[in-house]
Design a protein with these regions (language model features):
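Non-catalytic surface loops within mature trypsin-like serine protease
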Residues: 104, 125, 140, 180-182
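Active-site-adjacent substrate-binding region
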Residues: 130-158
Length: 214
């Protein structure tokens, strides 16, 4: 890909009004942590001369889009994200856009600590080869930055999953799960200076490597 014509879209995680999505002790809120990391990654990429956009920076939808129905509000949020990415694809050509949605994982939704830990990357069940290449580049960057890696098999680095933002965006798209917000060790690392730097750095390095290879 041509660095000068590539649009990198970084996706933030969820909303403050989305139930759960935090560590059992409340130290980590996924929507807040994700936005902090995305902001840092975008700033680093821009400083290196890349074009970076963020799909949704606010912590909640505008009042006019909020709803008593959790499902309806979530669907509105996801639709807004997909529309943002696809409009950039329409304006710039889908081959010149890539999408990386930055999340935290969870083993349960019960407010308890769990044993599962580590980093993983997801692609759509109908992912293109470009999406798989992007996932592989991020996987390699996570591994080189010392993160414990989770993969479905020794031969495959990415997890196929039916996720709305991956299946409905027109460009190469992946979703990263950056450790578990319900694992004590992972939370401690996420909140450490070294952990924050590693999470941000792996995204910068992985995206740069993909643009170089694609």
């Amino acid at each position: 890909m041509d660095k000068n014509s590539t649009i990198i879209v970084l996706g933030t995680a969820h909303r403050m009004r989305e139930p759960g999505k935090c560590s059992p002790d409340g130290r980590v809120k996924e929507c807040v942590y994700s936005r902090e990391i995305v902001s840092e990654v975008a700033a680093k990429l821009k400083a290196l001369g890349y074009k970076a956009e963020v799909d949704f920076t606010d912590l909640d939808l505008p009042k006019s889009m909020q709803s008593p129905s959790v499902t309806l509000e979530r669907n509105r949020e996801l639709g807004m994200r997909v529309n943002f990415v696809n409009e950039l694809c329409r304006q710039n050509g889908a081959k010149n856009v890539l999408y990386v949605s930055v999340h935290l994982n969870a083993a349960g939704a019960d407010g308890k600590w769990h044993d599962a830990k580590g980093w993983q990357v997801h692609v759509s069940t109908t992912a293109s080869q470009s999406s798989k290449l992007l996932a592989n580049c991020l996987f390699d960057a996570a591994k080189s930055n010392g993160l414990k890696i989770r993969q479905p098999s020794f031969m495959q680095k990415y997890w196929p999953q039916s996720l709305y933002v991956l299946g409905n965006t027109k460009c190469p798209a992946v979703l990263t799960e950056n450790l578990f917000q319900d694992n004590k060790d992972d939370v401690d690392y996420l909140l450490s200076e070294a952990g924050r730097h590693a999470i941000a750095r792996l995204h910068v390095e992985g995206i740069m490597k993909y643009i170089e290879k694609a």
